[in-house]
From Swiss-Prot:
Protein encoded by which gene: sprT
Pfam families, per database record: SprT-like, Zn_ribbon_SprT
Similarity annotation: Belongs to the SprT family.
Domain SprT-like: 22-165
Residues the record lists as binding Zn(2+): H78, H82
Catalytic residue positions: E79
Name under which the protein is recorded: Protein SprT
GO cellular component: cytoplasm
Amino acid sequence: MSTLRIPIALQQAVMQCLRHYLQLANQHLGTAYPEPKVNYHQRGTNAGSAYLQSFEIRLNPVLLLENKQPFIDEVVPHELAHLLVYRQFGRVAPHGKEWRWMMEQVLKVPASRTHQFEVASVRSKTFNYQCKCQQHSLTIRRHNKVLRGESEYRCRQCGEKLQFITINPD
């Protein structure tokens, strides 16, 4: 897989946003937390991830390029809040009351757990499975575990083991 090149202006916008919210947090909390490392290696449908111990934020380059400023405005403070909560409170629920407080009271942004960006360009192929009551879509990773006999999946509604039917077209 080739690496996407993020334009310098977009990287600068990410860092400007990050620094703005970090400054807000440091002023509000009376702290001097350092600037986290930022990279653009997040894959799949996740917009970003916060790596707590390494104080690092990973951003999805495809979703960033497709959504630009809305991505920056939503995802950067979301992931920064995870890092700040970990530094301030230790290990707590990922989107718990501490995280919501950090988002709303400290960073002054809405506390949204998930993004609403279009993910068709980053979604992987899925595989159709069936139970007694409905059809399910499994990712390639889960499908391969079934094929290798490493896992089996059951319906949360009826409890029946899922049976493979077809591959979903892209």
